[in-house]
Amino acid sequence: MSNDKQLKAVAFGEVLWDIFGNEKKIGGAPLNVVLRMKALGADTDMISCVGKDPDGDAIINEVEKLGLETNSILRSDDYPTGLVNVTLDERKSATYEILYPSAWDKIILNEETRELVVNADVLIYGSLVCRDEVSRNALYELLNTHTYKVFDVNLRKPHYDYDILKDLMQSANFIKFNDEELTEISEAFDSPYNTLEENMNFICSLTNATAICVTRGKDGALLLWDKHLYENNGYFVEVEDTVGAGDSFLGALVSCLLTGKEPQEALNFACATGALVAGSAGANPEISISQIQNLMHKR
């Protein structure tokens, strides 16, 4: 994929270590999204916080190795770098124990981080970072900017409530759910509908969002864009683990859509990207454009 223009993308939220037994991999949904966007040609920044501890030093080193600037990843004297214990079930689906409090719960903005968002084409944020009021208040301030906003819903019990989710949805131009999240949130807001398509339109009617995407695991995804519905039924891969697959999907989709790609082409590209991540270990495997295109044309 060649970008017609270079996107400037900023993500706000958690940067942490995913712990798989004796192994740890860098993660955090917003970081995963912008890493994929960077791999696809975007100019990216990550606003977060890690501890002044060995885990934090290791994250800074790792992020620099991955080619991201670390100036907007702040350091905390008082809180440790975030850790998540990841457990995979027999279907290789992940469950998460997210330790609290962590440094990313305590993100405090400065002039540089505010300026990054004001000058960006797109701000990507999730719901998990709002579990603590310090980071939540920082995000709410950024949501007052005119930058295009992408909300990556990330329901991790018990770290969310519906009032905050409603605020986050109403601030977004684009909202991404998985199918279970869309169903849960639609029911919580008294949707009379049963299908994903109906509930996508229902969420649009509740919010200011003009685009909604819903992932369906191995069955691909739906995209509501400019009042048209697009669908991809998924690409087959042998699943290694699902960690980060939805994040890479979103990074690819936003990169394509905001650089002028046709919505169906963008959705196909994003579904193939997410599938290849699910077929690889960890949240941020290296994936080439040719691998993505080969999978798109394979079926």
Tell me the role of every PLM-derived stretch.
Residues 1-10, 62-65, 70-74, 90-229:
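Ribokinase/PfkB-type carbohydrate-kinase core domain
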Residues 16-19, 156, 181-183, 237-238:
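A short, flexible beta-alpha/helix-coil linker loop
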Residues 32-35, 118, 170, 264, ...:
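A broad detector of short, well-ordered amphipathic alpha-helices
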Residues 1-8, 189, 193-299:
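Conserved phosphate-binding/catalytic region of the ribokinase-like
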Residues 5, 9, 18-84, 88-93, ...:
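Substrate-binding N-lobe of the ribokinase-like
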Residues 19, 97, 184-185, 277, ...:
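Residues that scaffold the ATP/ADP-binding catalytic core of kinase and kinase-like folds
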Residues 13:
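Active-site beta-alpha turn of Rossmann-fold NAD(P)-dependent dehydrogenases/reductases
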Residues 85, 96-99, 232-233, 253:
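Beta-strand scaffold of nucleotide-dependent catalytic cores
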